[in-house]
Amino acid sequence: MLSEKTIEIVKSTVPLLQEKGVEITTRFYEILFSEHPELLNIFNHTNQKKGRQQQALANAVYAAATYIDNLEAIIPVVKQIGHKHRSLGIKAEHYPIVGTCLLRAIKEVAGAPDEVLNAWGEAYGVIADAFISIEAEMYEEAAHKEGGWKDFRNFVVVKKVKESDVITSFYLKPEDGGKVSSFIPGQYVTVQINIEGETYTHNRQYSLSDAPGKEYYRISVKKEKGVDTPDGKVSNYLHDHVKEGDMLPVSAPAGDFVLNMDSTLPVVLISGGVGITPMMSMLNTLIEQDSKRNVCFVHAAINSNTHAMKEHVEAVDNEYEQVKAYTCYSAPTEKDLEMKNFDKEGFVEREWLQTIIPTTEAEFYFCGPVPFMKHINAVLTDLGVKQEHIHYEFFGPAASLQ
């Protein structure tokens, strides 16, 4: 239990964290990887280079300071981060290392006096204990489920399917021939990649793109091509070099962006680009479980060349009366225009969305590029959708949709 004095000191640093949070977390990662380079086998190098992880950590530290007198308020965030940590294999022994490096960064960047550093040291201990406790439960749950396991398990690529010009699916079965654990639609796995010539292992988290209950897991990966940045190292490696019969270490499913199976409300699934992957798991689960809930499936893509799983969604739309699917192309091809195989040209605008969603009294799930998600979140909020019915997933470190 933290003393009132400690709480007061930590809360007094909130303005400082608001101003210098990213500077502190940037320095923190420099210290961490300089002194513990083995941790580069866990963290996403691309997110480091683009500053995403630094921003996400700064947001988390700021929230911890703000709610240090009521940590229950940030337990949902702790659980969300905990899912990622468990999926990546972060353990209790990593927390003291992180704490030491974080305090050094606060001292170096902010020139914090000993009183502040001591208070933050105490606060970090309490916060770390919360993470360790929650993550320990997650490790136990993942390991003790039927077909479950701890850390990483070798899977074989039994099938590789090109879904569009940019997205390819990988069907994965356990190398040991055992069962795979069930999961909740919307969850993801971490795939571990060792690229020849690279010093460190690469970990990437991919949504499971089919319903649970199969003998395999399916992930569907976009080949990331950079415009002003390098191409996605791991996604390009998977597309170009990983073939059927190859082996990939995979973590047990994790994540809290999940379909609410207890709700009876209609479901609206909105995706942009590769954000379609968790939506496919949700859609397939609803139809395979013979759910009577109305489903509105909205997908935005550049055109039919980049549109993955198009034929499958159209088949579901035709076969199941309760499912209505809509497609929006920002730059349709001449063939698209001739075939009229989409519903709207341009973007998913408020006026159009309002005409196709059955009701605002529904469970809304969306995923895609961050600008797309910010727009959808603003539209749904403007339409009066209740916050508890708005669910979304970031592909990468959490960011703000405001």
Swiss-Prot record:
Coiled coil: none
Disulphide bonds in the chain: none
Organism: Bacillus thuringiensis subsp. konkukian (strain 97-27)
Comment, domains: Consists of two distinct domains; an N-terminal heme-containing oxygen-binding domain and a C-terminal reductase domain with binding sites for FAD and NAD(P)H.
PANTHER family according to UniProt: FLAVOHEMOPROTEIN
GO biological process, one term: cellular response to nitrosative stress
Annotated protein name in UniProt: Flavohemoprotein
Binding site for FAD: 188, 204-207, 394-397
Gene name as annotated: hmp
Keyword presence, Transcription: no
Cofactor: record remark: Binds 1 heme b (iron(II)-protoporphyrin IX) group per subunit. Binds 1 FAD per subunit.
Active site as annotated: 95 (charge relay system), 135 (charge relay system)
Domain Globin: 1-136
Record-listed heme b binding positions: 85
Region of interest (Reductase), residue spans: 147-402
Keywords: Detoxification, FAD, Flavoprotein, Heme, Iron, Metal-binding, NAD, NADP, Oxidoreductase, Oxygen transport, Transport
EC number: 1.14.12.17
